[in-house]
Swiss-Prot record:
GO terms for biological process: lactose catabolic process. InterPro entries: B-gal_small/dom_5, Bact_Beta-galactosidase, Beta-gal/glucu_dom_sf, Gal_mutarotase_sf_dom, Galactose-bd-like_sf, GH-type_carb-bd, Glyco_hydro_2, Glyco_hydro_2_AS. Its EC number is 3.2.1.23. One of its GO terms (cellular component) is beta-galactosidase complex. Pfam families: Bgal_small_N (PF02929), Glyco_hydro_2 (PF00703), Glyco_hydro_2_C (PF02836), Glyco_hydro_2_N (PF02837), LacZ_4 (PF16353). PANTHER family: BETA-GALACTOSIDASE (PTHR46323:SF2). Transmembrane segments: none annotated. Keywords: Glycosidase, Hydrolase. The active site is at residues 455, 526. Belongs to the glycosyl hydrolase 2 family. It catalyses: Hydrolysis of terminal non-reducing beta-D-galactose residues in beta-D-galactosides. This is Beta-galactosidase.
C-alpha cells in the first residue's frame, strides 16, 4: 500500500501536526494587526487558487510514483471536488454512505491528489502550513517528502514544514481521501462532499513563537470590574509580552509587560448580542503583533435559569450549516456576512454551528456583530442507530405516535445509537474533536456554550469529553442533546452537562419539564423544522418559551436549504444525482433557499421574535419589551396607523422608554367605536443604523383589533334584477334570465356552468374540494389521507329538490364526498339560493366520520379564465398565511395575481393560501362568507403540485385555479416534529358555512 493505513486506524488521528491551539494570525505592525485582515500580515501567505489535480476512483488506483506523474486537471482551492465534475453529489441524512464496519472504509474510496508550487526564500524561521478544512483526511508532502497526516474535516490541521522547504520553487502535494475512520464520526445530515474546502495558508513564525494563549477573566458581583488573566505558551521557552488593552472606543486601558497577564480592569463595558462591545487586546512579542478582541460577559445558571450578564435570555436561534449551491462547503467572508446580515434582519440572535466548527474567522464575525454561539464539535454518528433496525426512525426515536412503535424497538435503536459513545476504540477520536474545537475557539466571546456534538448517543467517551471541557474552560456551559439517549446497560454521569436539551419536543414537553423545579434549563437545540412550507408552530413555541423562565428558547432547524445546482442549472436534492441511499428532499429544510432568498417561514419567525409586543388592555395599548439589555427608546421607533374598514385614516410615530423585560402604556388615543372594523397597525423600526442594519429597518409589526365585536363593512351592490326561468331534464337543471345562466349537475349536485351575458364565468364545473398538495409537513399524514381516498375524492348527489319564489330559486341538495374503494368522507346537506339579481348563496352543512383522518381543507374550487388572474381581497397578506402561520401578515386590502401568489418550493406543495379573508373580488366574481375564509389563486392545480417532484417540472393549468375554503388545516412542522395540534386541524364532526357569490363584470360599491 502506497499510503500508510492511518485512515483506518482510530489510534492515529494526526501525524506530525502542531498541537491544537487558539486561532490567531501574527502581524509585523500594529496597523495591519488592528485591521483584522489576515491577508495584510507579512507573515501570512494565502495558498488558495487554482491547484493541479488528479482524481482516482480508489486510493488503490494511486500509482507508486504519484508524486512524479503529470496532472490532468485544475481545481480551485478551496472547493469540493463534487462541484467540479469529479465523483457525484450524495445526500443522506442518517444512513452511512458506506458499509458499517468501523474503523474500515471501502476499498473503492475515491482519492484526490492536489499539487501547487510555492516560491520561497526560507529565513531562520518556522513555517507552519495550515489547512482550515479538508474532508475527510489528508496526507501532506513537501518536495516529495512525507510531512504528515491529519483527520477532522471541520477543524484546522497545522504542520510545521520548516525542515522540508528549500530556496526557490517548493512543491506542495496533498492527498485527500473521501472517507476515513473519522467519517464514522462525521455522519451529519448534509450533502456529503470531499476535498480541500477551506483556506490553506503558510505562516512565518519566529523560532521561539507564541504558540497559544488563553484569555480568562472573572467579573465582580456588580459586573463592573474584571480580573483579566492571559496564559501563554511559547514553542520553546517563556518570553515576556507587552500587553495593551483598548476599550471599545479605542482608548488605552492599560499597557503592561510580563510573561503572563493578571490585571484588574475597571468600569468595563459588557458584551451582549444586542450591544456587542468589544475591547482589543494587543500582544507584542519580540517580532510579532497579535490582536485579539475581547468581550466581557458572564454566563451562568441559577435556579435552573440561564443568565447572561445576570439577565435571563432566550435564544432566538437557528442551526447553520456551511452550504452553498455552487461552492458547497467552501464559504467566503462575503457569504457568511450575507447569512449574518439576513439573520440580524430577521431577529435571530443565536447560532448553533451545526454540526461542526465553522471556519475560525466565523466566530470573529459573530463577536463583532452580536450573536450567541453554541460551538459544536465535529461529531455525529447518527447512522449507527440504523445498524440492525430499519424502521421509520424519526417517529420512533422521537417518541412520536406510530403503529410500529414499541419500547423494545426504540431501545434497540438507542443501544445502536450509542455505539461510538461507548466504544473504547473511538474514545481518543471523540476527545480529540472536543479539544480541537475548544482550543481553537477558546478566546471567542460569542461562543458561550460548548456542544459535544450531535446525534451520537451517550456513553463513557462523552462523559470523558464533558469532564475535560469543564476542567479546561470553566467560563462556559456544556451542552449535548444526545445525553437523553443512553444504552440500556449504562447508568451515565450527566453532572458535567448544563442543559436539558431536546430536539423537536412539543410545547407540552416544555410545559411538562418546566412545571417542576429543575436544576438545568430547557433548550430545544432543534425545533420547528423549516422544511418547505413550514414553521406554523413558531408562535406556539414562543408562547411556551415565554411562559417559563427555565426555558431558554431554541434553535430552528435549519438556516438554509441544501441543494447543489444540477447540470440543468436547477437545484437538486437527494436522488437527483443517482446516489443511493438517499433521503430525498429532506435536505430542503431551511428558512432561506439555497441561494439565500427568504422563505415565508423566515418572515413568520421574524415577527414571532419581534423585539416588542403590544396588546389591548382596558382600552389602552400596553407594550412589552422583549429585549434583554436595551430600553425600547434606545432601539426603536414605533410607527402607527389607524385603519377603518381597510382604509388608513390617521397615524404617527413615537418613541417610548420601556426597560428590558418590562411594560408601559403607549400614549395613543384610540378612536370611538362607530361599529366599523378598526385596526391599529404598529411597525417597530430601528432607530440608528448598525453594521448590519440600516436605520428605519422594520424589526417587526403588530396589529390590534380595537373593537373585536365589530366586523368589516362589506361593499354594497346595485345589480339589475330579473326573474329566472327553470328547466329540468334527467341530468341537469338550467336556471336563466336575460343576464345570467346557471346549470346544476344533478349527478354531482354542484354547478357545472355559470354564464353572464353568454360568457362563461367558470370554465369547468365547480368542485367541492378537500385535497391539497401535501406539504413536507404532511409527509407523515399523507399516507393516511391517501388511504382514506382524499386525493381521489369526488361529489355525488342523492336527492335534489327545488322551488321558486319571487326573490329566488332555491335548491336543496343531499350529497356526499366519496372516493374509490372507500366509504363516505363527508355527508353534505346543501342549500343553493339563486337570487333575482344573480347572486348565489351556498349554505353547506357537513358531517364528517370522526374515525377518518382530519381533512386537508374543505371548500369550493373555481376554474376561471386564464386571463382572470388578478384578485383583490381583505385578509392576511401579502405573504401566504394559514390558521397557525399568519403572524408574518396583517389583515388588510391586498391585490395579487395567480403567478405572484405562487411560491416555488423546490419540491412543489401547497402554498399561497390566505387566511382570515372577509371578501375576495376578481373581474367577474365577488365572494364573501358567513365567517372569515381562506382562499388560494394559482396557475397550477393541486394535482399538478402533488404529482411533480421539482418546481421546474410544473405545467401551468389552462385556467386560473381559485380555491375558496371554509378552512385549511394548519402547516405545523411535522416533517420532523410534533403532530399538528388539534386546534389547527379540520377535524370537526360537523360544520356549517355559507358562501355568498356575486357574478358581475363591474362590481359597484
Amino acid at each position: 500500500m502506497i499510503l500508510p493505513n492511518y485512515f483506518q486506524d482510530p489510534n492515529t488521528l494526526h501525524v506530525n501536526t502542531v498541537e491544537h491551539h487558539a486561532y490567531f494570525i501574527p502581524h509585523q505592525q500594529n496597523e495591519t494587526a488592528l485591521s483584522g485582515k489576515r491577508e495584510q500580515s507579512d507573515y501570512f501567505t494565502l495558498l488558495n487558487g487554482q491547484w493541479d489535480f488528479n482524481y482516482f476512483q480508489s486510493y488503490h488506483d494511486l500509482p507508486d510514483n504519484f508524486l512524479d506523474i503529470a496532472f490532468e486537471h485544475k481545481i480551485p482551492v478551496p472547493a469540493n471536488w463534487q462541484n467540479h465534475g469529479f465523483d457525484h453529489h450524495h445526500y443522506t441524512n442518517i444512513n452511512y454512505p458506506f458499509p458499517f464496519e468501523p474503523p474500515f472504509v471501502p476499498h473503492q474510496n475515491p482519492c484526490g491528489v492536489y499539487h501547487r508550487t510555492l516560491q520561497l526564500t526560507p529565513k531562520h524561521k518556522r513555517y507552519l502550513l495550515n489547512f482550515e478544512g479538508v474532508d475527510s483526511c489528508l496526507f501532506v508532502y513537501v518536495n516529495k517528502q512525507f510531512v504528515g497526516y491529519s483527520q477532522i474535516s471541520h477543524n484546522t490541521s497545522e504542520f510545521d514544514v520548516s525542515d522540508y522547504l528549500q530556496a526557490g520553487t517548493n512543491h506542495l502535494t496533498v492527498v485527500v481521501l473521501k472517507w476515513c475512520d473519522g467519517s464514522y464520526l462525521e455522519d451529519q445530515d448534509k450533502f456529503r462532499m470531499s476535498g480541500i474546502f477551506r483556506d490553506v495558508y503558510l505562516l512565518e513564525r519566529e523560532q521561539n513563537y507564541l504558540q497559544d494563549f488563553f484569555i480568562q477573566y472573572e467579573l465582580d458581583d456588580e459586573l463592573r470590574h474584571a480580573n483579566l488573566k492571559v496564559e501563554t505558551l511559547f514553542s520553546r521557552q517563556p518570553q515576556a509580552i507587552e500587553y495593551q488593552l483598548l476599550n471599545p472606543n479605542g482608548f488605552t486601558v492599560f499597557n503592561q509587560t510580563d510573561t503572563h497577564l493578571n490585571i484588574e480592569v475597571e468600569d468595563i463595558q459588557l458584551w451582549n448580542a444586542e450591544k456587542p462591545q468589544l475591547y482589543t487586546l494587543i500582544l507584542h512579542t519580540a517580532e510579532e503583533v497579535i490582536v485579539q478582541k475581547i468581550g466581557f460577559r458572564k454566563v451562568e445558571i441559577k435556579d435552573g435559569i440561564l443568565l447572561f450578564n445576570q439577565q435571563p435570555i432566550k435564544f432566538k436561534g437557528v442551526n447553520r450549516h456551511d452550504s452553498d449551491p455552487k461552492t458547497g462547503y467552501a464559504i467566503t467572508y462575503a457569504q457568511a456576512h450575507k447569512d449574518l446580515q439576513l439573520m440580524k434582519q430577521h431577529n435571530i440572535n443565536a447560532i448553533r454551528t451545526a454540526h461542526y466548527p465553522n471556519a475560525p474567522w466565523f466566530s470573529e464575525l459573530c463577536d463583532q456583530y452580536g450573536f450567541y454561539l453554541i460551538g459544536e464539535s465535529d461529531v455525529e454518528s447518527h447512522g449507527a442507530s440504523m445498524l440492525t433496525v430499519k424502521m421509520p426512525e424519526p417517529s420512533i426515536l422521537l417518541n412520536h405516535q406510530n403503529d410500529l412503535q414499541t419500547e423494545r424497538i426504540r431501545q434497540d435503536m438507542i443501544d445502536n445509537y450509542c455505539y461510538f459513545a461507548r466504544d473504547p476504540l473511538f474514545k481518543k477520536a471523540i476527545l480529540d474533536r472536543q479539544q480541537a474545537n475548544v482550543e481553537r475557539d477558546k478566546n471567542r466571546t460569542s461562543i458561550i456554550i460548548w456542544s459535544l456534538g450531535n446525534e451520537a448517543g451517550y456513553g463513557a467517551n462523552f462523559e470523558a469529553a464533558a469532564a475535560w471541557i469543564k476542567q479546561r474552560d470553566k467560563s462556559r456551559l456544556v451542552h449535548y442533546e444526545s445525553s437523553i439517549y443512553q444504552h440500556s446497560a449504562d447508568n451515565n454521569d450527566l453532572s458535567n452537562l448544563d442543559f436539558y436539551s431536546e430536539m423537536y419536543g412539543s410545547t407540552e414537553d416544555i410545559d411538562r419539564y418546566c412545571a417542576t423545579a429543575q436544576r438545568k434549563p430547557f433548550v430545544l437545540c432543534e425545533y420547528s423544522h423549516a422544511m418547505g412550507n413550514s414553521n406554523g408552530d413558531a408562535e406556539d413555541y414562543w408562547q411556551a418559551f415565554h411562559r417559563h423562565p427555565q426555558s431558554c428558547g431554541g434553535f430552528v432547524w435549519e438556516w438554509c436549504d441544501h441543494a447543489p445546482y444540477r447540470a440543468n442549472g436547477q437545484f437538486g436534492y437527494g436522488g437527483d444525482f443517482g446516489e443511493s441511499p438517499h433521503d430525498g428532499n429532506f435536505c430542503m429544510d431551511g428558512l432561506v433557499s439555497p441561494d439565500r432568498i427568504p422563505h415565508s417561514n423566515l418572515l413568520e419567525l421574524k415577527n414571532v421574535n419581534r423585539p416588542a409586543r403590544a396588546e389591548l388592555i382596558d382600552n389602552q395599548i400596553v407594550i412589552h419589551n422583549y429585549l434583554d439589555f436595551t430600553d425600547l427608546a434606545d432601539y426603536l421607533t414605533i410607527d402607527y396607523e389607524f385603519v377603518e374598514n381597510g382604509v388608513v385614516t390617521s397615524g404617527g410615530n413615537l418613541s417610548v422608554s420601556c426597560k428590558p423585560h418590562s411594560s408601559v402604556i403607549l400614549p395613543i388615543e384610540l378612536p370611538k367605536n362607530n361599529g366599523h372594523l378598526w385596526l391599529l397597525n404598529l411597525d417597530y423600526r430601528l432607530n440608528t443604523a448598525t453594521e448590519l442594519l440600516e436605520a428605519e429597518h422594520s424589526l417587526g409589526f403588530e396589529q390590534l383589533n380595537l373593537f373585536s365585536e365589530n366586523k368589516l363593512v362589506l361593499p354594497k351592490f346595485t345589480i339589475e334584477k330579473s326573474t329566472f326561468e327553470v328547466q329540468e331534464d334527467h341530468f341537469r337543471i338550467n336556471v336563466h334570465n336575460g343576464q345570467f345562466s346557471y346549470q346544476l349537475d344533478k349527478q354531482k349536485g354542484i354547478f357545472s356552468r355559470i354564464e353572464k351575458a353568454g360568457k362563461a364565468i367558470i370554465q369547468q364545473p365547480l368542485d367541492f374540494n378537500i385535497w391539497r398538495a401535501p406539504t413536507d409537513n404532511d409527509r407523515l399524514i399523507r399516507e393516511a389521507w391517501q388511504n382514506a381516498g382524499y386525493d381521489k375524492a369526488y361529489t355525488r348527489a342523492y336527492e335534489i329538490q327545488w322551488q321558486q319564489s319571487e326573490q329566488a330559486v332555491e335548491f336543496s341538495v343531499k350529497s356526499a364526498i366519496v372516493s374509490i374503494s372507500r366509504g363516505r368522507i363527508l355527508t353534505l346537506d346543501i342549500r343553493y339560493r339563486i337570487f333575482n339579481d344573480g347572486q348565489i348563496s351556498v349554505e353547506i352543512n357537513a358531517i364528517r366520520p370522526t374515525e377518518l383522518p382530519y381533512l386537508p381543507r374543505f371548500g369550493l374550487r373555481f376554474w376561471l379564465a386564464k386571463a382572470e388572474n388578478t384578485v383583490e381581497y381583505f385578509g392576511y397578506g401579502e405573504q401566504e398565511s394559514y390558521v397557525d402561520k399568519h403572524h408574518l401578515a396583517n389583515l388588510g386590502i391586498y391585490h395579487t395575481t395567480a403567478k405572484q401568489n405562487h411560491t416555488d418550493y423546490v419540491k412543489p406543495q401547497e402554498n399561497g393560501s390566505h387566511y382570515g379573508c372577509e371578501y375576495l373580488k376578481s373581474e367577474n366574481l365577488f365572494v364573501s362568507a358567513s365567517q372569515p375564509f381562506s382562499f388560494n389563486l394559482s396557475p397550477y392545480t393541486q394535482e399538478e403540485l402533488t404529482e411533480k417532484k421539482h418546481y421546474y417540472e410544473l405545467q401551468e393549468s389552462d385556467y386560473s385555479v381559485l380555491c375558496i375554503d371554509y378552512k385549511m388545516s394548519g402547516i405545523g412542522s411535522n416533517s420532523c416534529g410534533p403532530n399538528l395540534k388539534d386546534q389547527y386541524r379540520l377535524m370537526e364532526s360537523e360544520f356549517k358555512i355559507r358562501f355568498d357569490l356575486i357574478f358581475d363584470k363591474t362590481i359597484r360599491q
